[in-house]
UniProtKB/Swiss-Prot annotation:
It comes from the Bacteria. The dev nomenclature derives from the increased expression (differentially expressed in virulent strain, dev) of these genes in virulent H37Rv versus avirulent H37Ra. The dos nomenclature derives from experiments in M.bovis showing the same genes are essential for dormancy survival (dos). GO terms for molecular function: DNA binding; DNA-binding transcription factor activity. This is DNA-binding transcriptional activator DevR/DosR. Homodimer. Interacts with NarL. Pfam families: GerE, Response_reg. GO terms for biological process: dormancy process; phosphorelay signal transduction system; positive regulation of DNA-templated transcription; response to hypoxia.
Amino acid sequence: MVKVFLVDDHEVVRRGLVDLLGADPELDVVGEAGSVAEAMARVPAARPDVAVLDVRLPDGNGIELCRDLLSRMPDLRCLILTSYTSDEAMLDAILAGASGYVVKDIKGMELARAVKDVGAGRSLLDNRAAAALMAKLRGAAEKQDPLSGLTDQERTLLGLLSEGLTNKQIADRMFLAEKTVKNYVSRLLAKLGMERRTQAAVFATELKRSRPPGDGP
């Protein structure tokens, strides 16, 4: 069962989302809010697995709310709900640590599936946003191998992150304790100069596309 918290400033939209997601036996809507302030007060108490956040809110925006919530609840997964798409908005969502974004005209069943996918640890990110993130991460050091400072084990870990695996799944693959994997992930993110595993996953995925077969992470 995936616990979901909804943040949207339109009550009619929230009611529709509650009815839609609540009808799925695998989803449990544990709370809702209409503003950033309400969300910051209610989400920690509700302890959801996934927070569905509207981009436009009366006292802020869903991107900043995502960043603030994740700073307090690192295991939370955020799904950004937007009425439009742009490379800049998608990049902002990734950099804030969001696990994905969906456009508001998405079909009901697809939204429920997206929430469950994010709750299961998978990322819903656009290839264009991934490419934009890569360009930003490379910057002036584009000619330098971004993996040069990583050990073989860290490269393996990066590849598994790109598959959207959870710490437990990675632990099983690498024959390590789950707590050890968590520590390794933190160290890997520090080396890459990133804050969220989602960023590392996007980085690794795009790196695989830009390199010859067999020369990835």
